[in-house]
């Protein structure tokens, strides 16, 4: 059936049929009665509406198919909704416009800010995180560094058991030295594991088989000073040179040692504290001259009266203060001579991050502070010539 013929044919034989144009544009007064329709195949109003709709949807090329469908009254599957099932969009060419569903709402979460177990922290856009322009991983998140994550978990486990008062006295320091096998005699061999990269040593193994010596030759302490002096000076906030004398009174294990520190020249008391060791964790660095030990302790001011055996030592120390930690180069003299390099985390920042429960990234900041501390130790350790 030709729709154009239905609209434009002036032949009186078909003029009584209501045109498609009048159906679309006239007020909804209902479809013509059956008496006005010469087509005996369309036996009802709904049949005519369905027939006209089928013709509009299929076009001129489908006339025969539509006629057969109208005769057989078979259900029709539409490739797109018919006009009576779509929202009106206007007339003319706009009436045939495709009706597409609104685009899906994009996920507005920034994947770089997700705190996934496989990610370490928030990162800038992936296109700026690598010099190749490639994303840092298939997720766009840089995986955490395993040694630092292990140290962070270790620290979190201990800090979580402390009271708010104890947290205010926490000290975390890292020293370079050698992890040694516990053997008889003065000459103890450095730990030799079948690995080629640094790793945290199992705590049970350390307690049963190992000890740690933080003593360095004095020549290496001077070399470490040159390394620190040659580093970028803009990161050094200040330096300090002190000479102190410590009086150490060994107390019970649950109380720790009492230490009175005096100025070596004037004798003025600088500090009176009770220091108690909490835990240690050791990192074996097989390709570097020395290993690393991190020690967690509490140092609280006290007015206790000194008791017990006293030992003294003289400390000649040069300190470099950085944002987040301080580096100490110390020559110790007493019953024996020794030299030590240690870096101590900024306790105010460390505990401030840890206790800030309102910050969803507080442990990310703790981990980053530990990363900075360990990277600074690595920087010096890898430049020493043992």
UniProtKB/Swiss-Prot annotation:
Looking at the record's lineage, which domain of life comes first? Answer: Eukaryota
From start to end residue, where is composition biased (Basic and acidic residues)? 93-115
Q: Where in the cell is it found?
A: Nucleus
User: Which reaction is catalysed here?
Assistant: a 5'-end triphospho-ribonucleoside in mRNA + H2O = a 5'-end diphospho-ribonucleoside in mRNA + phosphate + H(+)
One Gene Ontology cellular component = mRNA capping enzyme complex
Q: Which BP terms from GO are recorded?
A: 7-methylguanosine mRNA capping
For activity, the cofactor(s) needed are: Mg(2+)
Start and end residues of each stretch annotated as Disordered: 1-137
Question: How does the record describe its quaternary structure?
Answer: Heterodimer. The mRNA-capping enzyme is composed of two separate chains alpha and beta, respectively a mRNA guanylyltransferase and an mRNA 5'-triphosphate monophosphatase.
Protein name per Swiss-Prot or TrEMBL: mRNA-capping enzyme subunit beta
Query: Per the UniProt entry, what species is this protein from, by scientific name?
Result: Yarrowia lipolytica (strain CLIB 122 / E 150)
Q: Which gene encodes it?
A: CET1
